[in-house]
């Protein structure tokens, strides 16, 4: 392919985008790239070897861990610990943040938060899954163990974030705060190649993504917004199309490319929402804003929320700017109604 650029080449080219450019972030992203290849290889074996199904234990959220959750968590942790840029990680699959105590990691500048395998319950039925990651500069002194404060930073302090989607093709999409770029994995070469440069989400979309099976439990503002999406107003592009996969990465990726909104509101059973702020919502919010969209909890900008705990949950509305603004309007009008 003429002019093809690999992820490694692109990272080095764009190193100057990072305010403290020294090659550390490039090396960190390289470790994520390596782990993604390993996890991708294992996912592609699903159904051939005993890696699907439940692992028989629950994570801190009370969710049954899938075997591939555990596998992906260990591979990403190992890849990050093997470089000298990361002093600790926080993961959906770990009760507490994990400090890397090797001599190698003592002077590391970064912490990584991740959902190692989002949508893993879909593996058994061959539906797209993904990895989400978020990178911060530590705030504690270099040379000391990482602290809780290193991980509980608001999203606007992220220095990089991204996701890997394991689907019909495997893609890695990331930002360092200077636009969003996507790379497709070429298995014949064993490398990620630039396929989607400077990704931008349309300001308007015609796709809404929400689990309508929970409709009865939604806030009134969300119910009214869904009805708005379903109204027959051709001059306004409505009714919109409903598309919901049940894998955040897959739903987000489609809407990023096509234009749309993903909604996971609070419900009666989950009044604080269900998605985790630090390693699901913040990285996706960083990406969508860099792509020209918006991310909100229904009232506030996601990236401005101050985390108080590692596995904190929030309502989440993310996607095309005008669609997110519209759902915020409905939530404001019907705020006092159940």
From Swiss-Prot:
Kindly list the positions annotated as binding Mg(2+) 2.
115, 118, 280
Task: Give, as in the UniProt entry, the pathway in which the protein acts.
Answer: Carbohydrate biosynthesis; gluconeogenesis
Q: Which key words are in the record?
A: Carbohydrate metabolism, Cytoplasm, Hydrolase, Magnesium, Metal-binding
Enzyme Commission number(s) of this protein: 3.1.3.11
Subcellular locations according to the entry? Cytoplasm
Recall the taxonomic lineage recorded for the source organism.
Answer: Bacteria, Pseudomonadati, Pseudomonadota, Gammaproteobacteria, Vibrionales
Q: What is this protein called?
A: Fructose-1,6-bisphosphatase class 1
Q: Which organism is it from?
A: Vibrio vulnificus (strain YJ016)
Record-level Gene Ontology MF annotations: fructose 1,6-bisphosphate 1-phosphatase activity; magnesium ion binding
- Which is a GO BP term held by this UniProt record? gluconeogenesis
UniProt remark on cofactor binding: Binds 2 magnesium ions per subunit.
